[in-house]
Regions:
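A cross-kingdom feature strongest in bacterial/archaeal respiratory oxidoreductases
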Residues: 3-106, 136-344
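Non-catalytic, well-ordered alpha-helical segments in soluble enzyme domains
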Residues: 111-136
Length: 346
């Protein structure tokens, strides 16, 4: 295994977002550029991004769709599609590549580089010129620049890595003390958040083809659900599609249950990316928004969530139920034995 150093200061974090929200709330931010993101919808609820954004006098949103964040911004700028953009990228081992557009922009739109260039360099220039100038000053510092630049354009990759391998000594002993902070109270659950396999974090919610794709394990389409174990379902008498109220601290959501073999009995899995209000004609009001339960301290999971079983049901579409025989009077007697042998019970 090879290890390469990465400059982590260049990677944004929730800590930065939390600091930004605090500054917006205190009126310290007069102008804000939001580049291709939708934090009003997908930022952790404890940050209160939407309310803080309302206190910014001039908020500019570079976006390819009018979404939840666009509605609270003063200005919206049409963003280029990825296939219309110049840029660059770096692999984990330090090789760099030039991102070249496949087509000219179809509309009067802008890329992230075009928006930032006048701000960073006090000079309005094309995205191509910006990328080329950056490479000249940081990547190809010696030799015949034009020749090396043209070769990188042709090959698609600059074959001299800019990162050097480092020697890493493995930790001889790992402390388990950190696990003491992650304990569950009785009758409480760990709530795990996972990106959707079809709409990811919600950015693809308006794509009907992706909404139609059955999800792994559950085969659900056009919806998300709270994945619970069979033991919990039996204990609380929960059926597929029965509405649950899930509470974490002062926040709560309503979402249908889906019984999932193999799910840990103390864990509930919630899929992100649904419940959009401004994603487009196809994606609006599809599924349930679970972002209100996320916390900036642990955005991947939260502890000590509770559930209330509601006397409501919601129809869920799962392709795995097609051609089911469990209700057939001839097949039903042997179904329980077959299920016990084939499924993973926890």
């Amino acid at each position: 295994i090879d290890y390469y150093p990465l400059n982590m200061s260049q990677i944004s974090s929730l800590k930065n977002l939390k600091s930004l929200c605090k500054d917006m709330e205190n009126g310290k931010i007069d102008k804000l550029f939001i580049l291709g993101a939708n934090p009003v919808y997908d930022s952790p609820s404890d940050l209160g991004f939407a309310e803080s954004l309302k206190k910014v006098k001039n908020a500019v949103h570079l976006t390819n769709i009018i979404d939840e964040t666009s509605k609270l911004c003063s200005w919206n700028i049409a963003m280029n599609h990825y296939f219309e953009c110049w840029g660059d990228a770096m692999t984990y081992d330090g090789h760099v590549s030039i991102v070249q557009p496949q087509i000219m922009p179809l509309f009067d739109s802008r890329s992230v580089i075009q928006v930032l260039s006048p701000i960073v360099y006090s000079l309005e220039q094309s995205a191509y010129d910006t990328v080329k100038n950056v490479w000249k000053s940081t990547i190809i510092k010696s030799g015949n620049f034009e020749r090396e630049w043209e070769k990188a354009l042709h090959d698609g990759l600059y074959k001299r890595p800019i990162l050097k391998k480092v020697n890493v000594k493995p930790i001889s002993k790992v402390s388990t003390a950190i696990l003491n902070d992650y304990s569950l109270d009785n009758d409480m659950f760990e709530i795990v958040f996972t990106p959707s396999s079809s709409v990811y974090d919600g950015r693809y919610a308006n794509n009907g083809w992706l909404q139609e794709i059955p999800k792994p394990v559950t085969s659900l389409t056009w919806d998300n659900a709270a994945l619970i174990s069979m033991k919990v379902a039996k204990k609380l008498n929960i059926k597929n599609g029965q509405m649950l109220e899930i509470n974490v601290g002062n926040n709560s959501i309503k979402i249908p249950a889906f019984i999932t073999p193999g799910q840990n009995q103390k864990s509930i899995t919630l899929e992100l990316g649904y419940g959009r209000k401004f994603s487009g004609r196809i994606g609006n009001e599809v599924g349930f928004n679970v972002y209100p339960l996320r916390d900036s301290n642990n955005p991947s999971f939260v502890l000590n969530g509770s559930i209330n079983v509601l006397n409501e049901t919601y129809p869920l579409a799962s392709t795995q139920d097609h051609h089911g025989l469990e209700d057939d009077k001839y097949a039903a007697p042997g179904f329980d034995d077959l299920a016990n042998n084939c499924l993973l019970y926890t």
